[in-house]
Amino acid sequence: WEQPPADLLPILEANPDITVKNLNGLGFQTIMRPNTLNAPMDDVRIRNAAIAAVNQKDVLDALVGTPELYNICGAMFVCDTPLATDVGSETLTAGNGMEKAKALLAEAGYDGTPIVLMHPTDVASLRSQPVVVAQAMRDVGFVVDLQAMDWQTLVGKRASQASIADGGWHMFITNWVGADVFNPLVNNMVNGKGKDGGWFGWPDVPKVEELRTAYATSQSLDEQKKIAEEIQKIAYEEGMYAPIGQYFVPAAWSNTLEGVLDGPAPFFWNITKK
């Protein structure tokens, strides 16, 4: 079983015929992604207010529930990696950004426009976070339209650059395998190409693109660390996205299997059956 729900782990662990082990040391990153095209999320202050409102612990308690299986982590390139840094994430990881969020909303002149937050209800690892985030945003003054849908509908809807009046959206939440976000080249959320070549949400941040190119051509780890830190700093300032927690999902398999390998994704070689 690749990803058993956390509440079933005690049952699996109590079975002497089953091995339960975390194979993915990088874990998963759950993230919130704003749409920079649609007002009021086109205002960086509104995006940063939404991010500041969130408490990672609340999100992770709802999603995972077991503290041993999650980390409070604001590192866009994953905690406990060479590029991990806290730069820009101090309020997010402290979970004390409510007053900051309220101040940003006041400064931006937020007028109560409903924020369309898509809520996939059919995927266990994605249905809790939007509820927690929506309430956190409401607590600081946002009006949130939490739109329930299945994951496939969300995947289709998030690709649309349409206005809200034409069925567009403001924000969604998804999860990434750590290996898919652990440097600036593979992390889609720090793509700053905007409407032409950017990932869903489409932030247009040319400086980040310059830095990603510099990262790609750098041959020094120390230099890459500095570049990654600067990218993260700008990404937080621009409200490109926010990691809202790192979590781990132990796998479970029959003791009749041998040779199961650690890795960032399941490997189906080297396995034999007794």
In which residue ranges do the predicted regions lie?
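Long beta-strand-rich cores associated with HINT superfamily self-processing modules
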Residues: 251-274
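Alpha-helical secondary-structure segments
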Residues: 6, 14-17, 26-72, 112-126, ...
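Extracytoplasmic/peripheral linker and loop segments enriched in polar/acidic and small residues
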Residues: 45-48, 145-155, 184-255
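Small-molecule pocket liners
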Residues: 28-33, 198, 267-269
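Ligand/substrate-recognition segments at binding pockets and active sites
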Residues: 2-7, 70, 102-178, 187-188, ...
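Extracytoplasmic/secreted proteins, especially bacterial periplasmic and envelope-associated proteins
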Residues: 3, 7, 11, 45, ...
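Structural transition elements
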Residues: 68-107, 123-128
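Ligand-binding "clamshell"
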Residues: 9-22, 165-168, 182-197, 254-258
